[in-house]
Curated annotation (Swiss-Prot):
Primary localisation category: membrane
Function: Proton-coupled amino-acid transporter that mediates the transmembrane transport of L-histidine and some di- and tripeptides from inside the lysosome to the cytosol, and plays a key role in innate immune response. Able to transport a variety of di- and tripeptides, including carnosine and some peptidoglycans. Transporter activity is pH-dependent and maximized in the acidic lysosomal environment.
Listed name of the protein: Solute carrier family 15 member 4
TM segment ranges: 42-62, 69-89, 98-118, 161-181, 197-217, 225-245, 319-339, 364-384, 406-426, 460-480, 491-511, 536-556
Lineage start: Eukaryota, Metazoa, Chordata, Craniata, Vertebrata
UniProt topology in membrane: Multi-pass membrane protein
One annotated GO biological process: L-histidine transmembrane export from vacuole
Subunit structure: Interacts with TASL; leading to TASL recruitment to endolysosome.
Gene disruption: observed consequences: Mice are fertile and look healthy but display impaired cytokine production in dendritic cells. Reduced uptake of L-histidine in brain.
Pfam hit, one: PTR2
Family indicated by similarity: Belongs to the major facilitator superfamily. Proton-dependent oligopeptide transporter (POT/PTR) (TC 2.A.17) family.
Database matches in InterPro entries: MFS_trans_sf, POT_fam, PTR2_symporter_CS
Signal peptide, first to last residue: none
Keywords for this protein: Endosome, Immunity, Innate immunity, Lysosome, Membrane, Peptide transport, Phosphoprotein, Protein transport, Symport, Transmembrane, Transmembrane helix, Transport
Length: 574
């Protein structure tokens, strides 16, 4: 391809068996991408795994809902910024340089967290805390005024959000580009190579998550947050070096213009021309007579007097068909992002066992370790799916389309939210009978006498949902997109994922209002024992259930349209 740079090393190899030929000559490039992604994910989960605990504890003392909202907003930013990252790569820098720049920005933002964790540097960034009088929030003032503020003060909020924004922008750009960049390394080997790359790419993501949750989260909770946040910083530094050294084996191409720019120009032109045509048509009869299935965009084509080529207009039309699928995935992501926010908050109020009593310092099981059940399940099932299940289904013509797999994932994530709601209902009943005071990360939590292991089902259900919905979503976004818009489509896929995170944060803020009161506990900031978190979980399950029904309609319609366009059975498409 013109303008595309092939690898300097390993470009010529002798003939190999069909099973290994898909990656022959590309193993070094794919390995560098997968290793960089593994390290980046280890750093990402090192930030997010215990962020709620970090902000909820001394000396920050954020309210539990505030800490959860901060994490949801951060994760939303990492996804919402993806289209910008895709535009930056396509229009200005190219994917390889955009990834390098984003890793450097990522590293800069991560430096804020060990600085916030160290007392001396924290005082420099945030100033010394102001002493405040302790008030009895349960007793009203004699004059009838409110005795407590509606929300707890958030210490170090500017420095915290500045670090989160920098990391979020870095993550967003990496996220938008490293997936299609990795697929570019094997795209000339056919769809089978692309499918297998996505499977192992997702496997690497979850291996990084396990290493982070297993080691870094333990260090943060039981040793120190300074060391626990220093390790992710080192991981990103190594990822930067790995990607920098891999330039000699990567297949790269220079920026050739952004599909987003063309997309917005075509959308703007079509809307303006349609509005002008409606004004000229008097009562609108002419527009109705001219209308056809794609008349809105066909008017942009050069053959119809417009300024755009046929290919660009057809690419935008393909994009418009894909967007409803992304919209339908928003509730899925809303539930998915509860795993490290409200699920983690629920964990802190369940009985967490001690795992070490060798020394005088007792170590407790990191609450974030439950997230590993999700990651371990994925690590075990993806190779099984890749090597055994998918080949058998393909030989018998039973491999479901990516949209059908997404629907299955939606069902399992709905079950996860429902299971969390049932557990929270039981927890609230038990905490009224017996309360256990447990210290986690220097913070005393009033927990129910109910083991944390009861959360395993909701994490396992989310893990199963990922195998279906997340992997199939990535595959759908890449394979359904026109070649000229693959980065743009991938960016939009993550953009709508970010909207799901913001929806979760917005819902959490809404139910925290005193008028609703599901998550308001103004007599004890950070304590959810006076809240109704189970209502929130049931609400999420209901929203996902309703969306699943709508998605089934959308997916069946899309598969039928794709089958008519491609001339093949719908079950074998995307």
């Amino acid at each position: 391809m013109e303008g595309e740079r092939a690898p300097l090393l390993g470009s010529r190899r002798p003939a190999v068996s069909a099973a290994s030929a898909v990656f022959a000559g590309r193993r070094a490039a794919c390995g560098a991408v997968l290793l960089a992604e593994l390290l980046e994910r280890a750093a990402f989960y090192g930030v997010t795994a215990n962020l709620v605990l970090f902000l909820n504890g001394a000396p920050f003392d954020w309210e539990g809902a505030q800490a959860s909202q901060a994490l949801l907003l951060f994760m939303g930013l990492t996804y919402l910024g993806s289209p910008f990252g895709g535009w930056l790569a396509d229009a200005r820098l190219g994917r390889a340089r955009a990834i390098l720049l984003s890793l450097a920005l990522y590293l800069l933002g991560l430096l804020a967290f060990p600085l916030l964790a160290a007392p001396r540097s924290r005082s420099f960034l945030c100033g010394d805390p102001r002493p405040e009088l302790v008030r009895n929030c349960s007793a009203p003032f004699p004059n009838g005024s409110a005795s407590c503020p509606e929300n707890a003060a958030r210490r170090c909020a500017p420095a915290t959000f500045a670090g989160l924004v920098l990391v979020g922008l870095g993550v967003a750009t990496v996220k938008a580009n490293i997936t299609p960049f990795g697929a570019d390394q094997v795209k000339d080997r056919g769809p089978e190579a692309t499918r297998r790359f996505f499977n192992w790419f997702y496997w690497s993501i979850n291996l990084g998550a396990i290493l982070s949750l297993g080691g870094i989260a333990y260090i943060q909770q039981n040793v120190s947050f300074f060391t626990g946040y220093l390790i992710p910083t080192v991981c990103v530094a190594i990822a930067f070096l790995v990607f920098l050294c891999g330039q000699s084996v990567f297949i790269t191409k220079p920026p050739d213009g952004s599909a987003f720019t063309d997309m917005f120009r075509i959308l703007t032109y079509s809307c303006c021309s349609q509005r002008g045509g409606q004004r000229r048509s008097g009562e609108g009869l002419g527009v109705f007579q001219q209308s056809s299935k794609h008349s809105l965009f066909d008017s942009c084509k050069m053959s119809r007097g417009g300024p755009f080529t046929e290919d660009k207009v057809e690419d935008v039309k393909a994009l418009v068909k894909i967007v409803p699928v992304f919209l339908a995935l928003i509730p899925y992501w809303t539930v998915y992002f509860q795993m490290q926010t409200t699920y983690a908050l629920q964990s802190l109020h369940l009985k967490i066992p001690e795992i070490s009593s060798i020394t005088t310092t007792h170590h407790t099981l990191p609450a974030a370790w439950l997230t590993m059940f999700d990651a371990v399940l994925i690590l075990l099932l993806i190779p099984l799916k890749d090597k055994l299940v998918d080949p058998v289904l393909r030989r018998h013509g039973l491999l479901p389309s990516s949209l059908k797999r997404i629907a299955v994932g939606m069902f399992f994530v709905m079950c996860s939210a429902f299971a969390a709601g049932i557990l929270e209902s039981k927890r609230l009943d038990l905490v009224k009978e017996k309360t256990i005071n447990q210290t986690i990360g220097g913070v005393v939590y009033h927990a129910a006498d109910l083991p944390i292991w009861w959360q395993i089902p909701q994490y396992v259900l989310i893990g199963i949902s990922e195998i279906f919905a997340s992997i199939a979503g990535l595959e759908f976004a890449y394979s359904a997109a026109p070649k000229s818009m693959q980065s743009a489509i991938m960016g939009l896929f993550f953009f709508f994922s970010g909207i799901g995170s913001f929806v979760g944060s917005g819902l959490l803020a809404l139910v925290s209002l005193k008028a609703i009161g599901w998550m308001s506990s103004h007599t004890d900031f950070g304590n959810i024992n006076s809240c109704h978190l189970h209502y929130y979980f049931f609400l999420l399950a209901a929203i996902q259930g309703a969306t699943l029904l709508l998605f089934l309609i959308v997916s069946v319609k899309y598969d039928r349209q794709r089958a008519r366009t491609d001339g093949g059975p719908a079950s074998t498409r995307t």
